[in-house]
C-alpha cells in the first residue's frame, strides 16, 4: 500500500495527522492507480450572543441572537473519494486525479440537498528534470499554504452553527486567511531544487460578488469576469528537514474586472484590478510546531475571493488577514494539542461606506488523537467573533462559541 494520499491536500493531511496514511494501489497495465480518501463527521454545539442587525450573520454567528444549535456535520474537509493514476511514457511522467466530495449533513426530512462537490479533475505531465504542467481543476495557488497549514483542517473551526446542510464548515477561512478555493487552471510547477520550488499559473477569472455580509452598504459587482484576461497566480517556497524542520512561503494573485456594475446595477461603472499577496512560515522541533501567517489585498474582499471587495461606487476595498498557531505532539501517545488565533479585516472606504472596518476573529483550541494509524479522534473549541466598527452608528458585535467532537478517517 502506498504511503501517500491521492488528494491535493495530502501534504497537509500527512503533516497534520500523527499517523501514517495509505492509499489503495492497483497496478493496471502501464498505469498505477491510487484510490484514497477521507471520511469525517462531527457533533457540534454552538452558542450565539451579541448584537442583532445587518452584518452580524456570517461565519456561523447566527444573527447576534442568544440561541444555540446542535448539528451533525462534516468538518473543514469534505468527505473524499479520489482516484489518481500515473505512468511513464515517452520520457514523461503522466498522471491524473479525479475526486468526488460528499458531505454528511442533512437538515430536512425527505430532502438530502446537493451535498456534493467535485473539487478535482486534472491531468499532469512533466519530468523531474524540468518540472510539471497541470491542466484542469484543483486547489488554487494563492493562499493554498495558509489552509494547508491550518490545524483545523482535521477538524471543524468556524461555521458549524449556521452551515448545517453545507458540504463543509469554514475552519479558519475568513478568520485569518482567504479561501484558496478550487479553480480551473493551467499551471507550471518547478522541480524541487534542494528544498526550493515555485508554481505559476493562469486560473479562471471570476466575477466580483456582493453579499449581505457587509452591513449598511451594498457592494459593486461584475458580470464579465476578467474580460479577455485570466487571473494570474503564483507561489514560491523553501522547505528543509532535520532536527529543526520547517517551511517558508510567499504567494500572490492579480485579476482584472471588466465592466464593474455599481449598486444600482448600472454596468460599465469602471474597470479595476484586485491584487493580493501573503507570506508564512512554519517550524517544527522536538514535537513543537509554530506557524505564522500574514496576507494583504486590494479588492480581494473578505473570506472568499472577490466577495465584498468593491464598494457601491466600484472602488476597491483594502483587507488583511493573519494568524498564529502553536502545536505540541505528545511523545508515545501521538496526540497533537494545538491553539491558534487569527483575524481578517475589511476596511471601509470613507466616501461610500458607513463602516470603518469589519473584523472577523477566532480562537481555537484542539486535540487530535490517533487511535489507529488511519483513524483520528478530534475535539475542538472555537470562539468566533465579528466586530463592525461604524463611522456614526453604534458599533455591532456578534459571537459564536462552538464545541466539536468527532472523528476523521484516512484511507
Segments (PLM) and residue ranges:
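Gram-negative bacterial Sec-dependent N-terminal signal peptides
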Residues: 1-23
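Outer membrane beta-barrel
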Residues: 24-46, 68-208, 228-230, 238-240
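Transmembrane beta-barrel strands of outer-membrane/channel proteins
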Residues: 37-45, 96-100, 137, 200-204, ...
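Gram-negative outer-membrane beta-barrel proteins
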Residues: 43-51, 102-108, 141-145, 206-210, ...
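Outer-membrane beta-barrel architecture
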Residues: 82-84, 122-125, 187-189, 235-237, ...
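Repeated loop/turn-to-beta-strand initiation elements of outer-membrane beta-barrel proteins
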Residues: 91-94, 129-133, 195-198, 242-250, ...
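Detector for outer-membrane/organellar transmembrane beta-barrel domains
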Residues: 227-365
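Outer-membrane beta-barrel "beta-signal"
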Residues: 398-411
Amino acid at each position: 500500500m502506498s504511503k501517500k494520499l491521492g488528494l491535493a491536500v495530502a501534504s497537509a493531511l500527512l503533516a497534520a495527522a500523527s499517523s501514517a496514511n495509505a492509499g489503495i494501489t492497483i497496478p493496471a497495465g502501464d498505469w498505477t492507480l491510487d484510490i484514497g480518501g477521507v471520511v469525517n463527521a462531527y457533533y457540534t454545539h454552538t452558542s450565539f450572543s451579541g448584537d442583532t442587525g445587518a452584518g452580524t450573520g456570517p461565519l456561523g454567528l447566527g444573527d447576534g441572537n442568544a440561541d444555540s444549535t446542535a448539528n451533525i456535520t462534516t468538518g473543514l474537509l469534505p468527505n473524499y473519494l479520489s482516484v489518481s493514476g500515473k505512468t511513464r511514457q515517452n520520457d514523461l511522467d503522466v498522471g491524473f486525479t479525479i475526486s468526488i466530495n460528499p458531505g454528511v449533513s442533512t437538515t430536512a426530512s425527505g430532502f438530502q440537498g446537493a451535498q456534493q462537490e467535485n473539487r478535482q479533475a486534472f491531468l499532469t505531465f512533466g519530468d523531474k528534470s524540468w518540472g510539471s504542467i497541470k491542466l484542469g481543476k484543483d486547489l488554487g495557488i494563492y493562499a493554498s499554504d495558509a489552509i494547508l497549514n491550518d490545524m483545523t483542517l482535521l477538524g471543524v473551526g468556524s461555521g458549524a452553527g449556521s452551515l448545517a446542510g453545507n458540504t463543509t464548515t469554514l475552519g479558519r477561512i475568513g478568520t485569518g486567511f482567504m479561501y484558496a478555493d478550487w479553480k480551473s487552471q493551467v499551471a507550471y510547477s518547478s522541480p524541487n531544487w534542494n528544498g526550493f520550488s515555485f508554481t505559476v499559473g493562469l486560473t479562471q477569472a471570476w466575477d466580483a460578488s456582493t453579499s449581505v455580509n457587509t452591513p449598511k452598504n451594498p457592494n459593486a459587482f461584475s458580470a464579465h469576469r476578467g474580460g479577455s484576461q485570466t487571473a494570474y497566480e503564483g507561489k514560491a517556497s523553501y522547505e528543509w528537514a532535520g532536527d529543526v524542520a520547517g517551511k517558508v512561503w510567499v504567494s500572490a494573485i492579480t485579476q482584472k474586472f471588466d465592466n464593474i456594475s455599481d449598486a444600482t446595477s448600472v454596468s460599465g461603472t469602471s474597470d479595476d484590478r484586485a491584487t493580493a499577496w501573503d507570506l508564512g512560515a512554519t517550524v517544527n522541533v522536538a514535537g513543537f510546531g509554530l506557524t505564522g501567517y500574514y496576507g494583504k489585498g486590494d479588492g480581494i474582499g473578505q473570506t472568499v475571493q472577490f466577495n465584498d471587495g468593491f464598494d457601491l461606487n466600484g472602488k476597491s476595498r483594502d483587507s488583511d488577514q493573519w494568524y498564529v498557531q502553536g502545536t505540541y505532539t505528545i511523545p508515545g501517545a501521538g496526540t497533537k494539542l494545538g491553539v491558534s488565533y487569527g483575524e481578517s479585516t475589511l476596511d471601509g472606504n470613507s466616501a461610500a461606506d458607513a463602516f470603518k472596518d469589519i473584523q472577523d476573529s477566532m480562537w481555537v483550541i484542539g486535540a487530535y488523537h490517533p487511535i489507529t494509524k488511519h483513524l483520528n479522534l478530534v475535539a475542538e473549541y472555537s470562539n468566533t467573533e465579528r466586530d463592525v466598527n461604524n463611522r456614526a452608528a453604534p458599533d455591532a458585535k456578534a459571537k459564536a462559541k462552538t464545541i466539536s467532537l468527532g472523528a476523521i478517517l484516512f484511507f
